[in-house]
């Protein structure tokens, strides 16, 4: 090398900068690498650790713009390639031990972010941030590749690493957008299917564990933890008519009967393999449609490393789990659900996240997504971390995620998990383990604001969708609109009803008279919220056994109790939710590691419960009185529940306009109630449309025939009455003929 070259004014001579660059610890690599205009002309600087030589070439002719000088043994090259400062199109040619290869220079491509996107990201108000952050395959200047972008404001350096660069953090050190904290780079040649993570150096120089992409759209099949380049799901949707008309399908006046399903254990192949999304559509949808459920609710589909969490400890909020297929496969599953007339609700977990090293925990070396103080940021019940809802960027990340599932996957609603843990700062904490809010109270004001903002965005941008709160306290106005001071959810799980009624049903019939109010208490508050009655997965795990296993008595009585209870539930005010397996009275506790016990359907007693659920869904949908006023006090009247000694309940459901009333009589003792007179709103013909004791369901067939004639004899404060045979451990449903 000549002395003149040594003294070239365009050379980078700062050994500290070069040392930081080759060590992969330079905060702003774009300030050094790539083409740079100088007084002497166009200088090109390249870092390629494996190369012996480097030169810039014309991509069309292959002619050389000039060889680059190797300035550092670890692969830093530099050279003046033109006296002109205009940047030509070029490629890089490298050699190593006789091998030659060409590649594009990632550092010649400018940022693809617009000023508005950067402003909204910086403000934490970008509701479609998933269109900018994450991995997006695209073409820049005619070159195919992938743009990677991630939020890590406290990092001193971020690189994207993957199988496209041998997981070498020196190769693709990213561009920082100052003041916003977003790092970005376009990597030529990176394509869908490539694995990647982010290699991050914290503010104090510490190298963090490689991180999966918080906005990654696909992940490796667990237990592997890398993100997969996929881009936003591409789908030719065929559900336009469904989406256009779904406003009435998710409304509080609509019949909503939800089949809760864990996709990994509903059915499996004989060798234990999961069904794919397509196979689930082939087998699950006809089954659900035949049973008459209006919706399925999928336990969390967001990617999660630990199957034993059932999805409630997600790491990849933007990625449908790869256990069952690709993002496009999941989109097709939703599309097929809609084609069959079935709505799709997914469980969504914004309350907390796991502490897995590859996840969000201390993402950039600081408590970025969580709180630093464990009194705010750590959940002892689940050993998980709690989102910092007061940080605008974090709240935006979550709100955008909620909208993402509705926008990109056309889901019809979100069931928000563990809302109670979000609302209260002292949730599951002892004195001294929590910090009061600014008013000295225990409400998490930041979480409340986040939920209101998310629900407002959801209903505003996707009319006809809904949100459902799993909320176990008496927090007021959960399903009240935000403009009326509520949290803005569409519905709330009625946990109180579930606990009270299951407690009642577990008592031996002879003792139920002492717990009579367990079945009536729920009507005191039944219309304070838009309630869903949930018999969810939580009731068949952790040693609770199965629903049928919690019923008292011998085998016949257990089934009779369950049938009577289901009939009570389906005719009680509130939308319905039943966890898979309950529809045929699975006897063992649910196990996420294996499929349901489908052989039960060969047993007439189990098949009878299955057929009862089908008929309950049918009358629930067909009789407006059973669903139109689920959430209104005008839709329910007690006829008689005044005699605890016989454990009977008689009530009426009403609809709007000319809807015919429905009268229900329940007997929760094993004694046949002959000549059981009930009051009715009018005389005439009343028809028994369902009897849980019907022999078709495995009952003793104490029924009332097709029709029941009434008399004008007043009873129970009603102008007419009828005499029934009330079956043992049975419920009867009557409708008045016009």
Swiss-Prot record:
SMART domains per UniProt: Aamy
Any one of the GO CC terms: cytosol
Pathway as given in its UniProt record: Glycan biosynthesis; glycogen biosynthesis
GO terms, molecular function: 1,4-alpha-glucan branching enzyme activity; cation binding; hydrolase activity, hydrolyzing O-glycosyl compounds
Single Gene Ontology BP annotation: glycogen biosynthetic process
Swiss-Prot/TrEMBL keywords: Carbohydrate metabolism, Glycogen biosynthesis, Glycogen metabolism, Glycosyltransferase, Transferase
Subunit composition and interactions: Monomer.
Protein known as: 1,4-alpha-glucan branching enzyme GlgB
């Amino acid at each position: 090398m000549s002395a003149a070259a040594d003294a070239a004014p365009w050379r980078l001579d700062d050994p500290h900068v070069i040392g930081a660059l080759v060590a992969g610890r330079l905060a702003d690599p774009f300030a050094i690498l790539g083409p740079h205009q100088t007084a002497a002309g166009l200088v090109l600087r390249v870092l390629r650790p494996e190369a012996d030589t480097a030169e810039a070439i014309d991509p069309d002719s292959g002619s050389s713009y000039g060889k680059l000088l190797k300035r550092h043994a670890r692969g830093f090259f530099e050279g003046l390639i033109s006296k002109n400062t205009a940047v030509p199109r070029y490629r890089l040619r490298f050699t190593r031990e006789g091998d030659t290869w060409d590649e594009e220079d990632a550092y010649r491509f400018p940022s693809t972010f617009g000023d508005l996107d950067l402003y909204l990201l910086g403000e934490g108000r970008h509701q479609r941030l998933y269109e900018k952050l994450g991995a997006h395959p695209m073409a820049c200047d005619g070159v195919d590749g992938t743009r990677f972008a991630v939020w890590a404001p406290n990092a001193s350096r971020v690189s994207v690493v993957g199988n496209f660069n041998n997981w070498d953090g020196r190769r693709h050190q990213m561009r920082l957008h100052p003041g916003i904290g977003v790092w970005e780079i376009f990597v030529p040649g990176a394509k869908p299917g490539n694995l990647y993570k982010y290699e991050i150096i914290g503010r104090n120089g510490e190298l963090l564990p490689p991180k999966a992409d918080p906005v990654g759209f696909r992940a490796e099949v667990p237990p592997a933890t890398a993100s997969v380049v996929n881009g936003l799901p591409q789908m030719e949707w065929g559900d336009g008519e469904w989406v256009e008309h779904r406003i009435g399908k998710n409304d509080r006046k609509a019949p909503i009967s939800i089949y809760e399903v864990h996709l990994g254990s509903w059915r499996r192949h004989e060798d234990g393999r999961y069904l794919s999304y397509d196979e689930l559509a082939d087998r699950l949808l006809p089954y659900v449609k035949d049973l008459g459920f209006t919706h399925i609710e999928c336990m969390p589909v967001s990617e999660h490393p630990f199957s034993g969490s059932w999805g409630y400890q997600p790491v990849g909020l933007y990625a449908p789990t790869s256990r069952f297929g690709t993002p496009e496969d999941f989109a097709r599953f939703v599309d097929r659900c809609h084609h069959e007339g079935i709505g799709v609700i997914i469980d969504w977990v914004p309350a907390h996240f796991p502490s897995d090293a590859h996840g969000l925990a201390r993402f950039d070396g600081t408590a970025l997504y969580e709180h630093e103080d464990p009194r705010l940021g750590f959940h002892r019940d689940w050993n998980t971390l709690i989102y910092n809802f007061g940080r605008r960027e974090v709240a935006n990340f979550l709100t955008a995620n909620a909208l993402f599932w509705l926008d990109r996957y056309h889901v019809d609603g979100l069931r928000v998990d563990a809302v109670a843990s979000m609302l209260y700062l002292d949730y599951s904490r002892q004195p001294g383990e929590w910090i009061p809010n600014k008013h000295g109270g225990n409400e998490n004001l930041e979480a409340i604001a986040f939920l209101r903002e998310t629900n407002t965005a959801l209903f505003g941008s996707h009319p006809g969708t809904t949100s459902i709160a799993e909320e176990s306290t008496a927090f007021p106005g959960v399903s009240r609109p935000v403009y009326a001071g509520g949290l803005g959810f569409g519905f709330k799980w009625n946990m109180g009803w579930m606990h009270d009624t299951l407690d009642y049903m577990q008592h031996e019939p002879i003792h139920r008279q002492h717990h009579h109010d367990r079945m009536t208490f729920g009507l005191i508050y039944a219309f304070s919220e838009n309630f869903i009655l949930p018999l969810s997965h939580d009731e068949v795990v952790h040693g609770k056994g199965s629903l049928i296993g919690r019923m008292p008595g011998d085998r016949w009585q257990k089934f009779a109790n369950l049938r009577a209870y289901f009939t009570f539930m389906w005719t009680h005010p509130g939308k319905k939710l039943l966890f898979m397996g309950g529809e045929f009275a699975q006897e063992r506790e649910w196990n996420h590691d294996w499929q349901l016990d489908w052989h039960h359907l060969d047993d007439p007693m189990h098949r009878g419960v299955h057929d009862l659920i089908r008929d309950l869904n049918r009358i629930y949908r067909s009789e407006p009185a059973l669903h139109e006023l689920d959430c209104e006090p005008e839709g329910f009247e007690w006829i008689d529940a005044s005699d605890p000694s016989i454990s009977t309940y008689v009530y009426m459901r009403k609809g709007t306009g000319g809807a015919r009333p429905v009268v229900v009589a329940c007997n929760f003792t094993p004694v046949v109630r002959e000549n059981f007179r009930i009051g009715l709103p009018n005389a005439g013909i009343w028809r028994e449309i369902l009897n849980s004791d019907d022999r078709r369901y495995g009952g003793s067939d104490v029924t009332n025939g097709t029709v029941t004639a009434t008399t004008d004899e007043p009873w129970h404060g009603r102008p007419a009455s009828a005499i029934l045979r009330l079956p043992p451990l049975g419920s009867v449903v009557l409708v008045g003929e016009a």
